[in-house]
Regions:
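Active-site beta->alpha loop and helix N-cap motifs at the rims of alpha/beta catalytic domains
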Residues: 2-150, 288, 312
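Generic alpha-helical structural signal
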Residues: 31, 64, 68, 94, ...
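C-terminal alpha-helical cap/extension of soluble enzyme domains
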Residues: 7, 12-18, 36-43, 51, ...
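Glycine-centered loop/turn motif at secondary-structure junctions
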Residues: 41-42, 78, 104, 165, ...
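A general structural signal for well-ordered alpha-helical segments in protein cores
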Residues: 30, 67, 93, 130, ...
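Catalytic alpha/beta core domains of metabolic enzymes, predominantly
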Residues: 132-135, 147-253, 257-260
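Alpha-helix N-capping/helix-start residues
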Residues: 21, 27, 60, 155, ...
């Protein structure tokens, strides 16, 4: 890919992976869902097999099929497609990325290996992990700061990784505003060309004001048009408008990412099934899904929010 830097801007949706009642991949629903999402003005691209896409419980062959379907849909719509991998070694990362080179994939987002959370890990190990990958493949890469402190990359290490040729973007989802701010400052001083995509849905609008090029947030599977409008406002420099839209969307986030957060995928799928975009809301174990009572509360709250144009209000917030 020529000059990939600069393309990874805007709203990226880590889509869910639909299953049938029997737990088998539902590729028909996947195509319908991703076709809808990529048709929305302001959506820059799709992200496959991330946490929202239940990547950790998908087999390699299943992931390949998801990458193919979502990638073809994205290409047809003129949008970008990012595949997610979770390698545990450098060799595995290189092998997985090479397997993607002939698929409709524009970049690969890499979950940090478990080793990075094993006690105090030297920054050189984290840097060399990416350096070795970039020497073995030309595939554009997306660095991922997950919301688990023991895995974090410090700002100086991020700047070093950003200097590698094919590291094109960074999903910053630490949910730590101080770390995010310091990282943005150091990247600016380093004149890094790597784009920053905010995964911090608590302060995504503020992320734009601090220099983020876009957002990569699972909650955007619900009320996608409004999240896209927030992104477009920020892209146009209207940060006050973006902040106002985020405030209106707070109730959407609350009905999806309430505790237990691990069931957020199930809640998103319930809404998408209700909207006719996927056939079932089936999730894979060890996720348990939600009770019939919570399902009713969720859809009641969703209906109320939808009637208001997804504006946050005490009268439509889900009962605790």
């Amino acid at each position: 890919m020529t000059n990939p830097q600069g393309r990874f801007r805007g709203l990226f949706i880590p889509h869910v992976t639909p299953f049938g009642d029997d737990g088998v991949l539902d590729l028909e629903s996947l195509e319908r869902l991703t076709t809808h999402q990529t048709s929305i003005h302001g959506v820059a691209g799709l992200v496959s097999c991330a946490r929202i896409g239940e990547g950790p419980v998908l087999g390699l062959e299943e992931k390949q099929r998801v990458y193919e379907v979502a990638g073809k849909v994205a290409r047809k719509a003129g949008k970008l497609h990012i595949a997610t991998i979770a390698p545990q070694s450098t060799d595995e990362a290189i092998r997985l990325i090479r397997d993607l080179e002939n698929l409709p994939v524009d970049a690969v987002m890499i979950f940090p290996p478990l080793l990075l959370a094993w006690g105090k890990v030297e920054s050189e190990l984290k840097f060399r992990f990416f350096e070795d990958i970039t020497r073995a493949t030309s595939m554009p890469l997306v660095l991922f700061q997950i919301p688990v402190k023991s895995y974090w990359y410090d700002p100086a290490t991020i700047c070093r990784i950003a200097g590698l040729n094919n590291v094109v973007a960074f999903k910053e989802a630490s949910f730590d505003i101080d770390l995010f701010t310091e990282t943005m400052k150091q990247l600016e001083r380093a004149k890094a060309s790597m784009e920053v995509l905010s995964g911090n849905d608590r302060f995504v609008a503020e992320s734009y004001r601090l220099g983020a090029a876009g957002a990569l947030i699972g909650v955007a599977n619900v009320a996608t048009e409004k999240w896209a409008a927030m992104d477009l406002a920020a892209q146009q420099g209207d940060f006050d408008r973006a902040a106002a839209l985020q405030k209106e969307l707070e109730a959407v986030k609350e009905i999806v990412f309430r505790e237990p957060i691990v069931e957020a995928v199930a809640r998103i799928k319930i809404v998408l099934q209700h909207e006719g975009l996927i056939k079932t809301a089936t999730v894979r174990r060890p996720q348990l899904g939600v009770s019939a009572e919570e399902r009713k509360l969720l859809l009641d709250s969703y209906h109320a929010l939808k009637k208001t144009g997804f504006r946050s209000s005490d009268s439509v917030a889900m009962a605790s």
